[in-house]
Regions:
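Bacterial N-terminal signal peptides that target proteins for export
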Residues: 1-9
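Juxtamembrane/transmembrane-helix boundary motifs in multi-pass membrane proteins
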Residues: 2-3, 198, 543
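Compositionally biased regions
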Residues: 5, 18-19, 565
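Beta-propeller folds
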Residues: 7-8, 24-440, 448-449, 459, ...
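Sterically constrained small-residue positions within well-ordered secondary structures
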Residues: 15, 147, 162, 259-262, ...
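C-terminal segment of classical bacterial N-terminal signal peptides
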Residues: 15-23
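Serine-hydrolase catalytic core recognition
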Residues: 228, 300, 439-741
Length: 741
């Protein structure tokens, strides 16, 4: 696809539109593309029958030490890092031949293979129920772990070749022929080895192996005191029930701690494979506390974690003796008037077991800090990175050059680039291919190379192998434009100002755009924390549904308001204790800009969003009822009283301490303001935004005499799965077709 203009967000302004209230500048544009074909939702929507063919092709790779291996369903290939050429290592048929004598089922795909030992020709193949360890040079099966259907693999440990798994809600560890049962009281109320605190604070799992593989730290969560939300499972269509089984819907209650209510209690255990014993960290009473970002010392003798109070404004980094569970010392303490949100564990330097890297936003942006343990556990802290940009991820270390490999948005707020940071000087060197676009990198074991998978607004996908020391890139793969031959709209990106705050937007113009015509507009909104919609990926990260709507003759507009991610603490915390208010103010600046455009029909503006975006959709429809004619809100939060403790209280405090904020942001009191056409869509079995939200809003509308439309997906969670997603977007599209066009 031809790109006529692409400028970074810091580059020279291309066009300027000015009113007394709003300034806007266009920062980049990808031209429309003429073609003979038109899109369907089967092409563009996840779950669609042709979606796979319409997505940019990819190459799946992993590192074998410093060697790059490409994986596909049928074979694994060694990739030459300087030429990009491939040599076959082994195939699926080879694996099945080497394990044939085990009487087990065949391996059907090699995507789930790993090469955990840099200097050994060993591959680990995980089929879900079997884990095979194979020497692919000797063509020999070294070991296998067999798991029954009721056993859930949690985490394998290459260092000790042990595996942690769950069975009947209890935690087990196996190594060789030995099996240890770590718990006996596991149940729906007592949860072991799984993610806790509703997946907040960077928690995505519940087990943590020590570096030597001889100890396993794990979460234990007691949620017996948490109120059940009464979810219900209904029978599947066409399911033939046994004569002994009722065909009546069954109760499937879910533990759901709502804001201001009793939350669960979490403790951390440490199992020692050498002694077969478990100790628990002596962290004190776990009531109304959060334990997160578990990590280990280099020698596996000490365990660290961040401890946060329920108000989430007082955070401590604490060290514990991994043998006894005793508290050793508090290393670091951070407070904030609004909230502290620890998301990343500390990581020790590979060349210095006395120093580690910590991430913090204490200066207003997420940055790296070098921490060195001194006498009497005094922590010496030196800031390594600084500036009005954020470290987005820490990928690891280049041990030879003593540098840290990071992803950041230093070059532009809408980009993600890879840098090597020298630990001694703090100097940063670009370590990706070209410095433009959005880069996702996979770091080699030594840190000398990154597998750089990226896109730009005009490039669907490129992959390069980059030397982190000198930035030299070896091209590996370039995806063809999967939309070649189709009629594709123009995608542009720019910014507007709300006071001194710059806000980035994306615009998708209708196909066959005519500037002399007036077009209906759909404003797509999310608006919440830990997300953004506008960046320098292909088509400025446009959702495929926007392309479909452009084909239908709509202009689509998306703006990242204050509260969204990667713009610093002040930008995010502007919404504190008043979710939706500042966000609406920013979104309306976008609408003001739209109204200055001669091709926008200001009488036909619609809005659509999901989850937090559903909350924003109804907020906008009921706060500015004369602006938005049509809205579609999916899985909307209606009242923050009913959202989960960790997320809700971070941004709103508790209902007890912020009653005015909860009332002001509740949509129940705005049901009477609804004037336009509003459709609410909900997954019946949503455990994220429970159906109580939308059902209560419907009750409020009945009482107020307003008339929203409503549709529910039985059996579906917060997001529609599989082909039902196509059905969902057909419904959303048709609603705008019926009432906005």
């Amino acid at each position: 696809m031809k790109q006529s203009l692409y400028k970074l967000a810091l580059a020279t302004m291309i066009t300027l539109s000015s009113t007394a209230a709003t300034q806007a500048q266009t920062l980049g544009c990808v031209d429309a593309q003429k073609g003979d074909k038109s899109f369907t939702l089967e092409d563009l929507n996840f779950g669609g029958k042709n979606y796979h063919n319409m997505s940019p092709k990819n190459r799946w790779c992993t590192w074998w030490g410093n060697q790059l291996v490409r994986q596909d369903a049928d074979a694994c290939y060694l990739v030459n890092k300087t030429t990009g050429k491939e040599t076959k290592l082994f195939g699926k048929n080879d694996i099945n031949q080497w394990i044939a004598h085990t009487r087990d089922i065949k391996v059907h795909s090699l995507y789930q293979t790993s090469f955990p030992y840099a200097n050994k020709s060993i591959v680990v193949v995980n089929t879900g129920s079997k884990i095979y360890t194979i020497d692919f040079k000797k063509h020999a099966l070294l070991s296998e772990h067999n798991f029954e259907n009721d056993e859930n693999i949690l985490e394998t440990c290459p260092a000790s070749e042990a595996v942690a798994y769950l069975k009947d809600n209890n935690l087990y560890v196996t190594r060789g022929l030995k099996v240890w049962q770590l718990s006996t009281d596991g149940s729906r109320d007592i949860v072991y080895g799984q993610s806790v605190h509703r997946d907040e604070f960077g928690i995505h799992k519940g087990t943590y192996w020590s570096n030597d593989g001889e100890k396993l730290a794990f979460y234990r969560m007691d949620q017996s005191m948490v109120t059940d939300y009464p979810q219900v499972d209904i029978p599947e269509i066409g399911f033939n029930h046994p004569e002994t089984q009722s065909c009546i819907a069954t109760a499937a209650p879910d533990k759901y701690p709502m804001a201001g209510e009793t939350s669960h209690k979490v403790t951390v255990g440490v199992f020692n494979l050498n002694t077969g014993k478990t100790v628990y960290l002596q962290a004190g009473d776990p009531t109304d506390r959060y334990f997160t970002n578990i990590s280990w010392s280099s020698d596996s003798k000490t365990i660290y974690m961040f401890e946060l109070n329920r108000d989430q404004n007082d955070c401590h980094l604490v060290a514990y003796n991994a043998e006894t569970g005793e508290k050793q010392c508090e290393l670091y303490h951070e407070t904030d008037e609004k909230y502290v949100e620890p998301q990343n564990p500390i990581v020790f330097l590979p060349w210095d077991s006395n120093s580690f890297i910590m991430q913090s936003r204490k200066d207003g942006y997420n940055h790296l800090y070098l921490c060195t343990l001194g006498k009497e556990n005094k922590l010496n802290i030196r800031q390594l990175t600084s500036g009005k940009w954020e470290v987005m991820d820490m990928l690891g270390f280049n041990t030879k050059r003593k540098s840290i490999i990071i992803a950041s948005n230093e070059l532009s707020p809408i980009q993600r680039n890879i840098f090597a940071v020298d630990v001694k000087s703090g100097k940063r060197t670009l370590a990706d291919d070209g410095g433009k676009g959005w880069h996702n990198a996979l770091l080699s074991t030594s840190g000398e190379y990154v597998y750089d998978n990226y896109s730009t607004p005009s490039i669907p996908r490129k992959i390069a192998i980059v030397n982190t020391a000198n930035g030299k890139a070896t091209p590996f793969f370039t995806a063809e434009d999967p939309w070649k031959g189709y009629n594709v709209p123009e995608y542009s990106m720019g910014s507007i100002k709300n006071g001194d705050t710059e806000l980035f937007y994306r615009m998708v113009k209708p196909i066959n755009f005519d500037s002399t015509k007036k077009y209906p507009v759909v404003v797509y909104v999310y608006g919440g924390p830990h997300a953004h919609n506008v960046d320098a990926r292909w088509h400025y990260s446009s959702r495929s549904w926007e392309t479909y709507m452009a084909q239908k003759g709509y202009l689509c507009f998306i703006l990242d308001n204050r509260g969204s991610e990667h713009r610093g603490k002040e930008f995010e915390q502007a919404t504190f204790r008043q979710l939706g208010q500042v966000e609406m103010e920013d979104q309306m600046k976008g609408v003001e800009y739209l109204k200055t455009l001669p091709y926008v029909d200001a009488d036909r503006i619609g809005v659509h969003g999901w989850s937090f975006g559903g909350f924003m959709t109804i907020s906008l429809m009921t706060t500015y009822p004369d602006v938005f004619k049509v809205g579609v809100a999916g899985g909307p939060v209606i009242d923050w009283h009913w959202y989960e403790v960790m997320y809700g209280e971070r941004y709103m405090d508790t209902p007890q301490t912020n009653p005015e904020g909860y009332k002001k942001t509740s949509l129940l009191y705005k049901a009477k303001n609804l004037k336009g056409k509003l459709q609410i869509i909900q997954g019946y079995n949503d455990v994220t935004v429970v159906p109580q939200h939308c059902l209560s809003f419907l009750k409020a509308c009945i009482a107020a005499g307003t008339q929203p439309d409503f549709f529910m997906y039985p059996g579906e969670p917060h997001n529609m799965r599989g082909h039902q997603s196509v059905h969902l977007h057909e419904r959303i599209t048709q609603y705008f077709e019926d009432y906005l066009k």
